[in-house]
């Protein structure tokens, strides 16, 4: 691949502010920010679980920095360590700016204050050495195709670049980081800390690389967090303490146990795993009744935070400015709940399918969350049985069966032959396509002897045309939402869950469909890596060839933890069969892809011409963006 050095200044003009020119002025934003500083606010963190929440989770300083838009990304500020104790900084802020209303604070003076009192974002972390890292892991060396094997070894080396640990002698009062004892793998880009559900696919990749001790350390970190807070937050910062993410700690432990048979470790942490399950049972359950009067207990995402998210403060108050004041607290709650889902954000959560201001996450009962919980129960009963606790194992096995039956009654539609989200407001299913409908197969939360069930799901996916895209399965078929969990983006975890859900089936036809999608996803990622030298957080699966994805509240990020993990897992799963055949790396010259409306997206040659320069733009912008944030 030929490398061309491009002067930084040449593309500097491409770096645009993420906020539009018609956004509200400072006075409007200041008024909305002041509303969130009331006594009825439920903040992301507070004095009950932190000792610096008034800096990072709420307060006039946080509001002022965002109202005056000191940073392109709100997350930059709340990731900055303190140079002094938080009480000292708060007192100095009050002395300098306490007499001014938010909009009247001088922006230059505020910037100078931040520069004097805060260090660079991410400065409390340092790189680490991966114990047992091997340049040629045995599993990867079994990959038969030489090009794919060489690529896998390059991805294996990226783990060393993503390994982080906390610097010694850190003062926890002076950082927003949640302190954990062991090293961990970060996703990459702006994501400088651990993230909950990302870690599952990172673990899958670490397993392929033979890094079992790193997996154990990451699990130990999560166990420490559950022991401290009673649950696992969205990510490793205190401003994430108001919400979780899809519950995948227990599946991570299952992966580790199957690799190592380390029963002593599993037995030691089992009480904590049960406690993590109980968080969801005690805080995220809602009852749903059918038209026959039967009531079912199911799970939904429901953060109680009713204020702007600290890491996305400016974006939240800009959206809130388009709503009446009395609707804003519920909007913030639904935004936080959408972030808890991991799908931040998607038409899946939007009342009108397009505008973020119509978000109604808490009114939606998601099929994938319930399938995750069902999977958790199956793993827990298995681990309990293996550690000599058959009675507790049976209790959880019975709970799983009750939930499996509830999932059939609440989510399954006989006509379509698939599971769908259930909307409490409309009392109906959302029949739009989302990959989440396959998670019951992934978590094996259906009757495994029913060979027709997986085939019905495959038939539905075929009917929706989601296999027709050259780069993989998109996250929805809803267009023009500008949300990252919608068309045309495809994500590693969703494609992996579709593949694994079908592969685990006993139906050989469905298993073959899994392989075809796996090869498509692998080759798409490979092409982008060949072009850019990077793995990306998400991919545009449309057009003649995939490219880095776009949309959402921030620029596309490289790295990237779960993308690397999925590829390594698929390459080792299909290590004998998957090969690059002649013509595989050529652009897709097939006829036009059909969209969900039955119309076409244009011929291959037209799409290639229109996108010839497009793949470079998000890459260049992302690099410039990261560069400026770290200056």
Predicted regions and their residues:
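Extended glycan-interaction surfaces of carbohydrate-active proteins
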Residues: 36, 40, 45-48, 52, ...
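Cleavable N-terminal signal peptides of Sec/SRP-targeted secreted and luminal proteins
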Residues: 3-20, 615-627
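TPR repeat positional signature
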Residues: 199, 250-253, 370, 374-377, ...
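Short amphipathic alpha-helical coiled-coil/interface segments
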Residues: 273-276, 393-408, 514, 518-522
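Inter-helical turn/loop segments and adjacent helix faces that build the functional surface
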Residues: 256-268, 380-395, 504-509
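C-terminal GPI-anchoring signal of eukaryotic secretory precursors
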Residues: 584-617
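Alpha-helical support elements that line or immediately flank enzyme active sites
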Residues: 195-222, 436-448, 496-508
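Aromatic/His-enriched, Gly/Pro-containing loop or helix-boundary segments
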Residues: 226-269
């Amino acid at each position: 691949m030929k490398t061309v050095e491009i002067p930084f200044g040449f593309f500097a003009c491409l770096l645009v502010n993420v906020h539009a020119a018609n956004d509200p002025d400072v006075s409007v934003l200041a008024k909305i920010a002041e509303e969130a500083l009331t006594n009825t606010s439920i903040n992301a963190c507070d004095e009950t679980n932190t000792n610096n929440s008034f800096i990072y989770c709420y307060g006039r300083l946080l509001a002022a920095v965002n109202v005056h838009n000191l940073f392109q990304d709100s997350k930059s500020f709340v990731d900055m360590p303190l140079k002094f104790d938080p009480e000292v900084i708060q007192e100095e802020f009050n002395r300098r700016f306490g007499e001014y209303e938010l909009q009247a604070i001088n922006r230059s003076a505020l910037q100078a204050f931040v520069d004097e009192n805060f260090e660079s974002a991410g400065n409390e972390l340092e790189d680490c050495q991966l114990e047992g890292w091997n340049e040629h892991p045995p599993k990867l060396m079994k990959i038969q195709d030489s090009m794919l094997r060489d690529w896998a070894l390059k991805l294996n080396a990226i783990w060393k670049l993503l390994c982080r640990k906390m610097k010694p002698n850190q003062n926890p009062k002076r950082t927003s980081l949640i302190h954990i004892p062991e090293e961990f793998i970060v996703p990459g880009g702006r994501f400088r800390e651990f993230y909950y559900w990302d870690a599952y696919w990172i673990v899958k990749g670490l397993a392929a690389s033979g890094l079992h001790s790193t997996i154990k350390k990451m699990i130990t970190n999560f166990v420490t967090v559950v022991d401290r807070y009673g649950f696992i937050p969205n990510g490793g910062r205190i401003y994430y303490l108001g919400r979780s993410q899809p519950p995948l700690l227990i599946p991570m432990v299952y992966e580790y146990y199957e690799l190592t048979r380390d029963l002593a470790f599993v037995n030691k942490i089992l009480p904590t795993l049960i406690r993590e399950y109980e968080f969801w049972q005690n805080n995220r359950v809602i009852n749903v009744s059918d038209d026959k009067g039967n009531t079912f207990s199911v799970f939904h995402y429901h953060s109680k935070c009713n204020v702007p998210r600290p890491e996305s403060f400016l974006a939240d108050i800009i959206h809130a400015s388009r709503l009446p004041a009395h609707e804003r607290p519920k909007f913030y709650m639904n935004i936080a709940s959408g972030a808890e889902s991991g799908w931040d954000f998607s038409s899946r959560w939007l009342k009108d399918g397009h505008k973020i201001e119509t978000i109604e996450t808490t009114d939606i009962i998601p099929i994938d969350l319930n399938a995750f919980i069902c999977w958790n129960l199956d793993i827990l009963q298995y681990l309990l049985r293996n550690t000599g606790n058959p009675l507790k194992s049976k209790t959880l096995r019975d709970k799983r069966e009750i939930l499996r039956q509830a999932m059939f009654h609440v989510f399954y539609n006989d006509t379509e032959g698939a599971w769908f989200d259930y909307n409490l407001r409309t009392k109906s299913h959302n029949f739009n396509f989302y990959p989440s409908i396959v998670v019951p197969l992934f978590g094996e939360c259906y009757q495994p002897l029913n060979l027709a069930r997986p085939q019905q799901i495959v038939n539905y996916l075929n009917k929706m045309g989601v296999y027709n895209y050259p780069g993989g399965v998109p996250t929805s078929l809803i267009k023009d939402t500008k949300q990252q969990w919608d068309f045309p983006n495809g994500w590693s975890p969703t494609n992996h869950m579709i593949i694994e859900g079908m592969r685990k089936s006993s139906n050989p036809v469905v298993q073959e469909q899994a392989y075809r999608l796996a090869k498509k996803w692998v080759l798409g990622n490979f092409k982008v890596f060949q072009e850019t030298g990077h793995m990306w957080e998400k991919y545009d699966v449309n057009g003649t060839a995939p490219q880095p994805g776009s949309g959402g509240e921030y620029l596309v990020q490289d790295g990237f933890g779960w993308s690397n993990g999925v590829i390594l897992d698929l390459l080792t799963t299909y290590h004998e069969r998957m090969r690059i055949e002649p013509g595989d790396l050529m652009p897709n010259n097939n006829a036009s892809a059909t969209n969900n409306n039955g119309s076409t997206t244009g011929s291959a040659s037209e799409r290639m011409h229109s996108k010839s320069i497009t793949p470079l733009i998000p890459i260049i912008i992302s690099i410039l963006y990261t560069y400026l944030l770290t200056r």
